[in-house]
Amino acid sequence: DHRDLHSFPTRRSSDLKKYFKRYHVALGNLLLLEYENGQKEAFLTARTTNGRCITSKDAALIMGEVMDGTRWSPAKDSRSIITKQYETVRFLEEGGYRMLYGASRIPKKGEKYSGDNYTFCESPGNQVVMSLSDGMGSGETAARESKQVVELTEQLLETGFSPRAALKLVNTVLLLAGPEQHPATLDLSCIDLHTGVLEAMKLGAVPTFIIGEEGVEIMEAGEVPMGILSGVEPVLMSRKLWEGDRIVMVSDGVLDALPGDDKEQAMQQYLESVEEMGPQELADQVLDFAVSFIPAPRDDMTVLTAGIWKRRS
């Protein structure tokens, strides 16, 4: 139910066939998918008619001209070249926004492995997913456990699950695995590059910080360790992101290193003082700031950052 499938409108279909014919490309079947966020995905069965090849990137440019000047690109898992044999190529309408990312981490003192795992991935519908999984404890066991949680989440998103449905399923899997499995917390930020809307989903995870024009916002959920209580709903928060907003996600080891009782406020005040910089530099600086208060890392420490900007045509 996350997308609707229908044929191209007759006139649009006719325009595409005529336009591609000018470039010596014959089109067969045309299918159009539309996601809940309004983003479109197209499947074109195509072949060249002059015995030569055309790249899917060039075909995407042709398509954009017919589709009201919108920007399209071939899907990463689709064919990169159209040849003289009919093949189906998948195209995605590009979102109005683009993102850049950064990550910085350090394991607990004395450990070779970090029990924190993170990922950045693009799921269908122009959704960018940042996930941070914090293994209970540290070292190799926690690393393996949190890696499994992150990989399962990625796989579910890639097969078309919504972020909320993916999290609920991951939580169920952990419950079935039992408490002896060193359950991990999960922090998921899903950014829709079509609309600029961020959905943050947390299961036992520490707050996320959004640096915007109005200051630094704290997005937090109540503490519920993932896989501990049955029937626990993931806490879902939503926020519209604007040009230049920056997202900062941290593992609990980062906040715990900060001075005072109100760790969130200490981080908020620090982030309000940082200058404009790239996401990777920001991630490094946040980690350096946290580490500066302790003689050695008492826990795994991870910082993820992302910045959002409007895509220029």
How should these model regions be labeled?
Residues D1-S13:
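Short, small-residue-biased leader/transition segments that mark boundaries at the very start
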Residues D15-Q39, N50, D58-E87, E94, ...:
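Catalytic core of PPM/PP2C metal-dependent serine/threonine phosphatase domains
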Residues N37-E41, G96-R98, P124-V129, E243-R246, ...:
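Short hydrophobic/glycine-rich mini-motifs in sensory/regulatory modules
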Residues K84-G135, T141, Q148, P234-L236:
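N-terminal entry segment of metal-dependent catalytic domains or homologous docking segments
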Residues E93-N117, N171-A177, V206-S238:
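PP2C/PPM family metal-dependent serine/threonine protein phosphatase catalytic domain
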Residues E111-G125, P183-L186, I218-P259, F293-R298:
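Acidic loop->beta-strand submotif enriched in PP2C/PPM serine/threonine phosphatases
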Residues G135-T159, G222-E223, L241, D245-P297, ...:
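Active-site-proximal, acidic helix/loop segment immediately C-terminal to a metal-coordinating Asp/Glu
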